[in-house]
């Protein structure tokens, strides 16, 4: 998500800038937002509807779709609408009206970069299938696992504005937050971390469990079974655990994995640290990514049967 202003010359958009009046992005933009304007001038983009890969008129396409929908309605069949996340109230109302008319209609939301494991993990942990609001501005200790929250994860422009709040040393703010990052490839977020450690994708779950066990030992909670990592990685995890524990309630652990198990353990870490209500708000949700892997998989199964 990015609230923007567009500079126009002779009716043509030529430059994107952030909207400083936005309470979410606060005037920020991203490379993705800046580059999106180029798609308007892509001569290879689709300019007409197509049928079987060939250009067709809107009249032909509309008639064919309407005829097929009417045939499905007459037979009492199912209609699925596959879409990216829908947040517009007017679009939701149109879909609802569509479903009322045709009946037996379901909206399936899908995202190319899925984070549905977060919502599923929160449903398991708290009974709420949501993506909570994260506040990096309240965190003095941040640990990330394969999570490019400054580049591409969920709401990077919003998170960047929050993150830099505690990364600038001033006369009134002489202390800077500390950021540990574990990832398999270099990301924008990892390059800005104070401590960065390369961890194989196959070892990410072990690293998360190791951090959980270190925090659980300090909290007097039960630990989880898991394998061991190399001594250098364990040493950095020890340092991260100590810094997190010293900043209980003012810390944040995030994970970019779309694995429900990993996200559930991360929930446990944040819970032991008392971060809910401070750096994580379950009462305020992020609705940008509403796609559900389970719904898409179910749709594929139904189409194959």
Where are these regions (language model features)?
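Generic low-polarity alpha-helical segments
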Residues: 4-6, 142, 270, 302-305
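Active-site phosphate/pyrophosphate-binding segments
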Residues: 195-304
